[in-house]
């Protein structure tokens, strides 16, 4: 009778790449079906109707479409106010995707977002499976691909899905480069990642911090301090071309030298003596009398908010705590806080359906609902940090992968502390947070024993 070790050798190796591809394509096909069955409707801009077809409206959907409409009407240098109040990057992406005509633009957008998300999830899982984290790769893949909020966001109008895919793609390429250690390919990976981080910043400027720190971490470890620092500088300069183009657009359009003029307003909502850190309560902000152009007023308001935080450390810490809770809060229930009312998942969520009756609403928003919500919030954070700690305790590559994920997660979280607490801001880093939670969950189910495999990968 064959021994256990011999039977293991005779057992065919599982083709994870094929399995990942099968599921990624299956989900993509299902999304295509959903996209082409979404009922068309009209919204109105400046007294004229605008057709919305093949997409759901995200939290700021109307504003993005208003910017897109301005670009269609007046071109890239449109003076439409929303294009300089908010970053014009996402409406410009929409304009680029309107090559089949404006009528098909939204359908093209959601197909593009869905395809990118499936590919990013697939590539991330494939690269993970080449490391000692192979046994975690399938669970992480399933948790990311089938998370209803994250996966359905690719069918909604909003930057969140593309930026979440961006973090997965850049992480996958970094892992691929570290494994291959091929200097000839490094320049290609550097260029691709720089463009991806640039496009992410193009749509949401605050993500540049995570991009810069991730790039430095990767290249310093890959090439050492001197060469790594030089390559990092080159990569960052490439990434900055994209937000710089928004400054150029705004200057040509309305004479404003800024990416957007809403930062101060957003920060002011989350600060002040009567602020809660979120969108609830009074929005009186901090004492400030800005003067000058809209861009100058925005800069002055940012300074006022920062000065208030420095002058009120106790109140600031309380607001930072509140914003952290809001950032990690559930999508629905008594603890939720943010702008995810249009989350597609909420239209079919059984918890939401329970609230249609008085008894169900009392259950969800009562004591039991609060306990469940807090367990969901704290449990998710516990799994995330446990997953990160599990990777930190491993050898170089696994620790490095954990650091790459945590850099993206922590920078996005910390930046929200000086702006406003909103669980929607969690979406861009949700793929990586689900990865760490998958590591934490599987390790926990194994009684705390990491599920590492031996491989000839980097040591």
Set out the residue ranges of the language-model regions.
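Loop-to-helix entry region of an early transmembrane alpha helix in multi-pass inner-membrane enzymes
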Residues: 83-84, 88-95, 100-119, 153, ...
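Membrane-interface anchor segments at the N-terminal boundary of transmembrane helices
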Residues: 104-108, 323-405
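Membrane-interface transmembrane helices that cradle and orient dolichyl/undecaprenyl
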Residues: 132-134, 170-192, 200, 218-224
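Membrane-interface alpha helices of multi-pass inner-membrane proteins
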Residues: 141, 188-204, 215-216, 235-241, ...
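Membrane-proximal stem/loop segments at transmembrane-domain junctions that anchor or position
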Residues: 251-351
């Amino acid at each position: 009778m064959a021994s256990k070790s011999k039977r293991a050798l005779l057992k065919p190796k599982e083709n994870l790449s094929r399995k990942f591809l099968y599921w990624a394509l299956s989900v993509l096909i299902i999304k295509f079906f959903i996209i082409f069955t979404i009922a068309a409707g009209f919204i109105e801009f400046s007294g004229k109707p605008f057709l919305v077809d093949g997409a759901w409206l995200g939290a700021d959907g109307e504003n993005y479409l208003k910017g897109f409409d301005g670009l269609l009407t007046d071109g890239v240098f449109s003076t439409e106010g929303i294009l300089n109040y908010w970053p014009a990057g996402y409406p410009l992406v929409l304009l680029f995707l309107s090559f089949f005509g404006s009528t098909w633009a939204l359908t093209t957008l959601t197909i593009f977002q869905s395809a990118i998300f499936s590919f990013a999830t697939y590539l991330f899982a494939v690269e993970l499976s080449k490391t000692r984290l192979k046994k975690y790769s399938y669970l992480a893949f399933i948790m990311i691909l089938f998370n209803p909020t994250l996966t359905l966001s690719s069918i909604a109008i909003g930057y969140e899905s593309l930026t979440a895919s961006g973090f997965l793609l850049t992480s996958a390429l970094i892992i691929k480069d570290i494994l291959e250690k091929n200097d000839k390919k490094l320049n290609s990976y550097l260029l691709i990642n720089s463009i991806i981080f640039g496009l992410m910043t193009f749509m949401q400027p605050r993500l540049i911090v995570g991009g810069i720190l991730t790039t430095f971490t990767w290249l310093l470890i890959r090439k050492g301090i001197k060469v790594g620092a030089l390559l990092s500088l080159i990569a960052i300069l490439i990434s900055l071309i994209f937000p710089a183009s928004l400054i150029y657009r705004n200057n040509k359009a309305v004479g404003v030298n800024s990416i957007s003029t809403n930062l101060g307003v957003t920060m002011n909502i989350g600060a002040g003596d009567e602020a809660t850190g979120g969108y609830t309560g009074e929005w009186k902000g901090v004492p400030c009398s800005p003067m000058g152009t809209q861009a100058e007023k925005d800069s002055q308001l940012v300074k006022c908010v920062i000065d208030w935080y420095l002058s009120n450390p106790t109140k600031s810490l309380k607001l930072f705590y509140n914003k952290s809770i809001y950032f990690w809060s559930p999508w629905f229930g008594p603890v939720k806080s943010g702008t995810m009312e249009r989350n597609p998942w909420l239209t079919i969520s059984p918890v939401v359906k329970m609230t249609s009756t008085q008894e169900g609403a009392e259950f969800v928003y009562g004591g039991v609902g609060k306990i469940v919500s807090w367990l969901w919030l704290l449990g998710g954070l516990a799994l995330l940090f446990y997953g990160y700690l599990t990777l930190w305790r491993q050898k170089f590559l696994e620790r490095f992968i954990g650091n790459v994920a945590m850099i993206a997660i922590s920078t996005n979280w910390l930046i929200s502390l000086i702006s406003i607490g909103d669980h929607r801001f969690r979406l861009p880093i949700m793929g990586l947070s689900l990865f760490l939670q998958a590591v934490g969950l599987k390790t926990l189910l194994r009684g705390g024993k990491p599920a590492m495999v031996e491989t000839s990968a980097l040591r």
